[in-house]
Amino acid sequence: MPRSLKKGPFIDLHLLKKVEKAVESGDKKPVKTWSRRSTIFPNMIGLTIAVHNGRQHVPVYVSDEMVGHKLGEFAPTRTYRGHAADKKAKKK
């Protein structure tokens, strides 16, 4: 269920400060964050944000199509290893 329009988009203040600082300085280093719940804002376009997936920080390069989505959508938390193979089918 999407967030109410009257509330507006959410972004953690500490992440917003880091992004503004990176934009001012023109720094190309990834902005490290644990805030997967923050919405991607237009001033983040062109930055690389390292989003934590529970184990490591996944670098996410922000493009204009990503605006309005959450950071966590681009850093998967689960790895799919495939289903168990059928032992009967392997023997034949």
Swiss-Prot record:
> What are the annotated GO cellular component locations?
cytoplasm; small ribosomal subunit
Is Nucleotide-binding set as a keyword in this record?
Answer: no
The domain of life for this entry's organism is: Bacteria
> Metal-binding among the record's keywords?
no
Sorted UniProt keywords: Ribonucleoprotein, Ribosomal protein, RNA-binding, rRNA-binding
GO MF, one annotated term: rRNA binding
> Which family is it part of?
Belongs to the universal ribosomal protein uS19 family.
Q: Describe its function.
A: Protein S19 forms a complex with S13 that binds strongly to the 16S ribosomal RNA.
The protein's name in its UniProt record? Small ribosomal subunit protein uS19
Q: Give the organism, scientific name.
A: Proteus mirabilis (strain HI4320)
